[in-house]
Amino acid sequence: MTHIQPKIKICGITRLEDALAATFAGADALGFNFSHTSARYIAPNNAAAIIKQLPPFVQTVGIFVEQSPSEINAIAQTCNLHYAQLHNDLYGVKEALAITTLPVIKVFRPNENFDVQEVKAFIGESHVTTYLFDAYRPDAHGGTGERIEATLAERIFQAMGNECYAILAGGLTPNNVAEAIRRIRPYGVDTASGVEKAPGIKDVAKMRAFVTAAQNA
């Protein structure tokens, strides 16, 4: 897509004060992690209570790892989510098409041998338009603080061109996000651990610094 100021998603929200602080810092979207294996897990009812108190125009994203499409549809309705982020390699085209209550963000965790044709095939078969690329680690589904190797990210994002909205995640912090944006030119950037005091507990100063760095890149 044509380069514009990148959209900013702050993920792993567990508290209302963090959600509001992220919003007022300038985040475009907030992520709520519904994976029971995550240190940033939030129960759907708690997420719904936070989302009800958000100001208008803030996008809300549910992160799903082990739920079925029917469970995702139900949680999305309970929480009034805008997007479902499918953060598990086991979610394929069939599962994406079965999520009918909201648009999907499909996550890929590329290793050095990653073939972008895998993404292009997914686009063609599912019509999903938004993809998030996170650092690969076989024992974890995101939130590790690890980065995608820069030349690998460049190769993927250049190859995708205008075919999708591509979001960069994985180890982004206030100190490195501007360089990553200038080099890779993603549609959006995503951070969780990079703006925290502890898993699920955000650092307001870091969130503000991250947003400022991303907007000024």
UniProtKB/Swiss-Prot annotation:
Its EC number is 5.3.1.24. It comes from the Bacteria. Pathway: Amino-acid biosynthesis; L-tryptophan biosynthesis; L-tryptophan from chorismate: step 3/5. Keywords: Amino-acid biosynthesis, Aromatic amino acid biosynthesis, Isomerase, Tryptophan biosynthesis. The keyword Amino-acid biosynthesis applies. GO terms for biological process: L-tryptophan biosynthetic process. InterPro entries: Aldolase_TIM, PRAI_dom, RibuloseP-bd_barrel, TrpF_fam. SUPFAM superfamilies: Ribulose-phoshate binding barrel. One of its GO terms (molecular function) is phosphoribosylanthranilate isomerase activity. It catalyses: N-(5-phospho-beta-D-ribosyl)anthranilate = 1-(2-carboxyphenylamino)-1-deoxy-D-ribulose 5-phosphate. Belongs to the TrpF family. This is N-(5'-phosphoribosyl)anthranilate isomerase. The lineage of its organism: Bacteria, Pseudomonadati, Chlorobiota, Chlorobiia, Chlorobiales.
